[in-house]
């Protein structure tokens, strides 16, 4: 990097993702020239992942409203919405404001809104064609309605439904849930969009067959609940579902109108373990250097710790010894048997499957680590080095904060 903190330019060209038309930018440094730890994004893999998931949504007959929380960048979001209607999903109001400034006009804030954030959300809604909020509580419904009434605006609202993840959402089997939907739907100050869920339990599956069953359950619960609401004279325009695992393997989404996958842009070690993708589909990794070598215990120390990889335990239900990520060479090839066995703030301990020979993996050697959870690891960096092959061709800056 130069003194400004940006990467040095060198001769070469690459395709920029900053615009829909092809533009050419000079390429940057090689991977081995980067400081570590560094967040790496493979541009061609991102483009392939976004294209495939978009095509899959179209084949299943559902509208794609991709989640942008994994990458939090304008560039990747533009790839996600290319060829689709342009709406996105966010997980923070900071993301919503950032993407609004970047030209996105239809945004769903997919976290139940607390009353304390309503003034900020209401102000932001004036800058958009639509900002949709989530709620699953009658007290919050009252607060959202009062906020809209006081400001003389209509706020768009989804009712969050629990389809088995048990993190948030109303129970679709309860009469109170129907009553809450009717309460929101009848308000002159609220625009009731419909019902929304996230099958987070899909991440606890062991293989694609189990994920496929979760996808079918997610669909069935939501379509049945929408039918119950309609019989109670509640208008339901949208049935919004989605996670990367379920959309990756779903076979039938009849009755669903919208899907909101997000992790598929990068994928990660967990997605490989549960059958959502192959290793070659992973677009995000963390570049680290060997800073210590301990042959007597077959261990290496690297300069990527919890603040570069996160401490997400990963798919321990599939592989109890998975460690904290997949270890690849600097060129992106797997290193069989290597495990990251522990992380502290700035240190990672890598266990080798065999004795270290003289000169093998010396201090200064580079590895790429595929994190267990790319959403968490990516959020730890303020910039990504965007690659084509081993050339850094761009730099993406994610939004941070809440």
Residue ranges, per PLM feature:
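Active-site loop/helix belt of alpha/beta enzymes
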Residues: 156, 163-278
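C-terminal accessory subdomain/extension
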Residues: 295-402
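Active-site-proximal beta-alpha core segment in soluble small-molecule metabolic enzymes
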Residues: 67-204
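Conserved, mostly hydrophobic/aromatic
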Residues: 46, 69, 99, 159, ...
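Active-site loop ensemble at the mouth of alpha/beta enzyme cores that anchors a bound cofactor
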Residues: 213, 245-327
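A charged N-terminal "starter" segment
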Residues: 2-123, 396, 401-402
């Amino acid at each position: 990097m130069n003194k400004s903190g940006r990467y040095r330019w060198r001769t070469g060209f690459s395709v920029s993702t900053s615009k829909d038309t092809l533009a050419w930018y000079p390429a940057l440094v090689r991977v081995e020239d980067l400081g570590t730890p560094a967040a790496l994004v493979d541009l061609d893999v991102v483009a392939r992942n976004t294209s495939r998931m978009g095509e899959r949504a179209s084949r299943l007959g559902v509208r794609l409203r991709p989640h942008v929380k994994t990458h939090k960048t304008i560039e990747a979001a533009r790839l996600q919405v290319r060829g689709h209607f342009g709406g996105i999903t966010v997980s923070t109001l900071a993301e919503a404001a950032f993407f609004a400034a970047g030209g996105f006009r239809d945004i769903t804030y997919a976290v139940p809104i607390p009353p304390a954030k309503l003034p900020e959300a209401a102000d932001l809604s004036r800058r958009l064609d639509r900002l949709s909020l989530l709620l699953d509580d009658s007290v919050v419904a009252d607060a959202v309605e009062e906020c809209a009434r006081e400001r003389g605006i209509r706020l768009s609202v989804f009712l969050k439904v629990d389809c088995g993840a048990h993190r948030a959402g109303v129970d679709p089997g309860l009469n109170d849930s129907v009553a809450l939907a009717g309460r929101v739907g009848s308000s002159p100050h609220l625009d009731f969009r419909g019902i929304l869920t996230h099958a987070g339990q899909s991440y606890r599956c062991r293989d694609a067959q189990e994920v496929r069953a979760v996808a079918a359950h997610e669909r069935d619960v939501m379509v049945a609940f929408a039918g119950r609401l309609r019989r109670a004279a509640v208008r339901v325009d949208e049935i919004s579902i989605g996670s990367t695992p379920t959309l990756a393997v779903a076979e039938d989404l009849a009755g669903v109108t919208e899907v909101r996958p997000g992790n598929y842009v990068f994928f990660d070690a967990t997605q490989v373990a549960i059958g959502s993708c192959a290793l070659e589909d992973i677009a995000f990794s963390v570049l680290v250097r060997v800073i210590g070598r301990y042959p007597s215990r077959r261990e290496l120390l690297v300069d990527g710790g919890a603040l570069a990889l996160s401490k997400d335990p990963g798919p321990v239900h599939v592989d109890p010894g998975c460690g904290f990520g997949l270890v690849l060479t600097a060129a992106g090839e797997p290193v069989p048997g290597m495990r990251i066995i522990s992380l502290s703030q700035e240190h990672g301990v890598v266990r080798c499957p065999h004795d270290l020979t003289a000169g093998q993996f010396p201090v200064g050697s580079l590895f790429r680590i595929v994190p267990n959870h790319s959403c968490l690891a990516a959020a730890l960096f303020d910039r990504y080095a965007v690659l084509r092959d081993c050339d850094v061709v761009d730099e993406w800056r994610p939004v941070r904060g809440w």
